[in-house]
Amino acid sequence: MTLELMRGNEAIAEGAIRAGCRFYTGYPITPQNELFEYMARRMPQVEGVFLQCESEVAGINMIWGAACTGTRAMTSSSGPGMSLMSEGLTTLAAGQLPCVIVDVTRAGPGLGRIAPSQSDYRQATKGGGHGDYHAIVLGPSSTQEMAELATLAFYLADLYRNPVIILMDGMLGQMMEPVDFDRVKSLPAPEKPWALKGKGDGPRKVVYAAPFDDPGLIQLNQELVEKYRKIEETEQRWEEVHMEGAEVAVLAFGSAARVALDAVQAARSEGWPVGLIRPITLWPFPRKALANLRRTVRAFLDVEMNAGQMQEDLERVIGPDLPIHHLGQGGGKIIYPDEVYEEIKRLAG
């Protein structure tokens, strides 16, 4: 086992390269610049393509072109840049083109600040652009997991021919931890008979940004709904910690889950009946992990570095019968374990 000490931004870039990413384009924006810089160094070493684009709008459309050829392609940005990419993202979904987008979130709204925040949750999990579409959204909580989820992201993108967003925040992006790349397994890409190869000696292939008539668009939407239904059924991922006998369930993702875990372990050591559920797929939301808890848990604590965006998804699963409390806020305010610990004691007492 060989461990490499690196930032989260670097780990996700190296994980992407080991997954077979050979096209990267992006525009500098904090707090994701280390990812951008790492790709600039590494892509030439693996005979890949690195392009610094003139804007996020240009970048996401370059991803469209690369994805049309079947190349594993990735871009990255942060909140304001993701907003600029929204038209390209919905067009990628309409064209059913696989790609990976990394969102290293910063505090908002507006231009915001580079302080860590989880305020892009709603934007990512509810699509991010116009139309009825979804991106698969993964939420890592460690540097090791960033590298591992990068490989999973490309696999899922190819499997479902769909954009995948890796949603993390500036704290995770800048955090340095050891990474064991022996655990980062590249998942093979499937055959892509739809991809444009430019050879001219085979059947004509066309990738459409949208159908040209109403019946075609209606049919596309029906196909997307069926695809998303399959993804929701088969791709829910989560981690459970100390949920045996838990009467209070803490729900948190990303860096907030690291904070919540410290508090849950401290409370458990003192006998408080509390456990943690950490969503790994933010979309599809891990409803299966929560549905049966209505019979055993008497309260939920949603811990997020935003105004409670994931709480809305939790409420849809749990319904009105059990109390759901939120701890946290946006604007770059970091949550501390003692805050979560005190809230756990209040709810469990």
Question: Which sequence ranges carry the predicted segments?
Answer:
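Thiamine diphosphate
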Residues: 1-127, 134, 326, 336-344, ...
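Glycine-/acidic-rich phosphate or pyrophosphate-binding loops and their flanking alpha/beta elements
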Residues: 7-11, 225-248, 261
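Conserved thiamine diphosphate
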Residues: 115-169
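Redox- and metal-dependent alpha/beta enzyme cores, enriched for Fe-S-associated oxidoreductases
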Residues: 240-277, 283-289
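Glycine-rich, anion-gripping cofactor-binding loops and their flanking helix/strand elements
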Residues: 265-269, 276-320
